[in-house]
Regions:
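Acidic/histidine-rich catalytic cores and adjacent linkers
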Residues: 1-6, 39-42, 47, 284-393
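Short, conserved DNA-binding cores of transcription-related domains
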Residues: 2-90, 94-98, 174
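Mobile genetic element proteins and their domesticated derivatives, centered on retroelements
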Residues: 37, 72, 84, 111, ...
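Active-site phosphate-binding and catalytic loops of NTP-dependent enzymes
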Residues: 43-58, 150-161, 173-178, 380-383
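RNase H-like nuclease fold core
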Residues: 63, 78-85, 92-101, 131-234, ...
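Short, amphipathic alpha-helical "recognition" segments used to contact nucleic acids or chromatin
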Residues: 106-118
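DNA-recognition alpha helix
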Residues: 122-133
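Conserved beta-strand -> loop -> alpha-helix junction used to position metal-binding or nucleic-acid-contacting
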Residues: 170, 232-239, 244-281
Length: 393
């Protein structure tokens, strides 16, 4: 019994590379992956197509098309299907595909947990079938979760190098806890390396604990893994974050996100007709060439609205200075570190995945999925270019 690689697949890859060069890499890789999955199915079944043998477990049942996004482009995959497996035999899904798509594996486990625990809906069932291509059992879910968790925990506990700048953010997801559905905080930290200016995802944490305790423990875990050399921390004014920074990173300057300050200011504008002028006034503050000019513009802003919008003037005088810390950095560095907008794409990718699951069965399931997503994003960042030129002034 032999299950060798089809020579036609190799010839196809060669032809694609000859005709298209590097631009054909995604097609060439898809051909190889499809061949690997076909070969894996034959080994799983114990027989190749049309092969008669007593060792055969079941039969091939065609292929299911799937488009997979990767760092080299979209891959048109053909996922092998099986049928007529003996009772008690686990279903087939190519390991070669799963190993390359951590976030998809995590999402399948999250949805499968809901299905197994009896909290699924008709919609979740359909998603499970669509993503997994087979029914799931509790043993399959446990095995998949254990393998994935070991890999993700290793990533979360890896050593951290010196980071010049750190950005912190928080988001909330729905999790089942104690018979009810509650908001669970997801804390994220990214950094800019002091040596090469590249961005990296430092860590992620999921917890139902009180905000200040969660932030303090999260920051402590980053320091334990080697975080040092931080010149500036940028974040929004999240509950408990400032207290956590004071406890764990005293003396490190804090920059409050200018974008969120702009948005928060609108809550204190008494008339719709004033909103555009208020926004422009704050832009004049934030876009000043140096700190002294920013403070002068802030003084003019407060004076301008002291009578016609006193609540806005008082709020601005107390809060806007927290968004001016970034003026201690070189001009080019300021544009990157004055807001948390650099985390926007990361949060979008997380949201795109978590909204499919809707409500997570537990904290571990949420942590698994979020970690898997940020690991993939981090790999893309590491393979990409410089985020901040540390030699620029």
């Amino acid at each position: 019994m032999t299950h060798g690689v089809d020579s036609n697949a190799i010839e196809q890859v060669v032809e694609v590379l000859i005709d298209e060069g590097l631009e054909g890499m995604s097609r060439a890789f898809a051909i190889l992956m499809n061949e690997a999955m076909r070969l894996e199915r034959s080994r799983f079944l114990g027989a190749g197509p049309y092969e008669r043998t007593e060792e055969r477990l079941g039969y091939g049942n065609g292929y299911k098309p799937k488009t997979v996004k990767s760092r080299i482009g979209e891959l048109q995959m053909a996922i092998p299907q099986v049928r007529d497996l003996p009772p008690g035999c686990e279903g087939f899904y190519p390991r070669s595909l799963e190993r390359g798509l951590r976030s998809e594996r995590a999402l399948k486990v999250a949805i499968a947990e809901m299905y197994v625990q009896g909290v699924s809906t008709r919609r979740v069932q359909k998603i499970t079938e669509k993503l997994c291509g087979l029914e799931v059992s509790s043993s399959e879910v446990s095995r998949a979760a254990a393998l994935l968790d070991d890999e993700l925990e290793s990533w979360r506990s890896r050593q951290i190098d010196e980071m010049a700048y750190v950005t912190l953010d928080a988001r909330y997801e729905k999790v089942r806890h104690g018979g009810s559905v509650v908001d669970c905080a997801v804390l994220l930290a990214t950094g800019v390396r002091g040596d090469n200016g590249k961005r990296t995802v430092l860590g992620v944490s999921v917890s139902l604990s009180e905000a200040e305790v969660h932030w303090r423990e999260f920051l402590a875990s980053l320091q334990k893994r080697g975080l040092h050399g931080v010149k500036l921390v940028t974040s929004d004014d999240h509950k408990g974050l400032k207290a956590g920074l004071t406890a764990r990173m005293p003396g490190v300057p804090w920059q409050r996100c200018q974008f969120h300050l702009q948005r928060n200011a609108q809550a204190y504008v008494p008339k719709m007709s004033m909103r555009r002028a208020v926004a422009q006034g704050l832009r004049d503050v934030f876009n000043a060439p140096e700190r002294a000019e920013a403070e002068r513009q802030l003084g003019l802003f407060v004076e301008r609205y002291d009578e016609k919008a006193p609540r806005l003037a008082t709020w601005a005088e107390e809060n806007i200075p927290q968004g001016l810390t970034v003026f201690t950095l070189p001009p080019y560095h300021r544009t990157r570190m004055r807001t948390t907008n650099g985390l926007e794409n990361l949060n979008k990718q997380i949201k795109r995945r978590t909204r499919v699951a809707t409500i997570f069965p537990n904290e571990a399931s949420l942590l698994r999925l979020v970690t898997a997503v940020v690991v993939e994003i981090n790999e893309a960042w590491e393979a990409g270019g410089v985020y901040i030129n540390m030699k620029s002034a």
